[in-house]
Design a protein with these regions (language model features):
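Short amphipathic recognition helices of helix-turn-helix/homeodomain-type DNA-binding modules
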Residues: 1-3
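A solvent-exposed interaction/effector surface
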Residues: 5-194
Length: 194
């Protein structure tokens, strides 16, 4: 095509749109990095194994159920959750968390997960979400493999019983340090909230 002022203006207009898109993407990346850094900093200051009653804010979650509760079933559920979040442009600096029924925990059944979730700081613009209610939660940070959570759950239940704390219907496992943050599974940190 010929060089002309009109052609150059069209070219500049297209370039400006591309730059705006890149700036928007970079802004989202920067926000994600800041939030993820904040999660890591807070986790580094949190003592593992210390049980606390914590006032928690209302939190938004996008959730999915696993068809089967074996490793493959959970891998598929997490994949569905990621696809759903991608489809609805839901981004979060939080790692995937898992929810169990408190009744199962009280029966010492520590691997009967019902749901995996993506925790969010804000209500998503589209799609289905659930609200984790604000209120007092019995919390503890567990360091180590998720298959070793049973002992930490036992301690939580004993503490609740000794303090006569009424537990809610669900237990939330917020993954704070996962494979993105630590190299070894033994260094993983999961925050339990009952």
């Amino acid at each position: 095509s010929k060089r002309s002022p009109k052609h150059l203006l069209l070219l500049f207009g297209e370039e400006e749109k591309l730059i705006d898109q890149q700036m928007k993407r970079l802004k989202h990346m920067k926000e994600w990095i800041k939030k993820k850094s904040g999660i890591i900093r807070r986790t580094l200051t949190e003592e593992t194994g210390v049980i606390r009653v914590t006032e928690e804010p209302e939190r938004y979650m996008v959730m999915t159920r696993a068809e089967k509760s074996d490793e493959r079933g959970w891998a598929e559920a997490v994949g569905k959750l990621w696809d759903y979040c991608e489809e609805h442009k839901i981004r979060s600096a939080y790692s995937i968390g898992y929810r169990q029924e408190t009744a199962n925990i009280l029966e010492e059944e520590y691997e009967r997960y019902s749901v995996c979730y993506q925790l969010l700081d804000q209500k998503p613009r589209s799609g289905v979400y659930t609200v984790r209610p604000q209120g007092k939660y019995l919390t503890v940070c567990h360091k180590g493999h998720w298959k070793d959570l049973g002992e930490t759950y036992r301690q939580l239940v004993q503490y609740a019983s000794a303090q006569e704390i009424v537990l809610g219907a669900h237990c939330y496992e917020d993954t704070l340090f996962d494979g993105l943050v630590v190299q070894e599974e033994r260094d993983a940190v999961t925050r339990l909230g009952l």
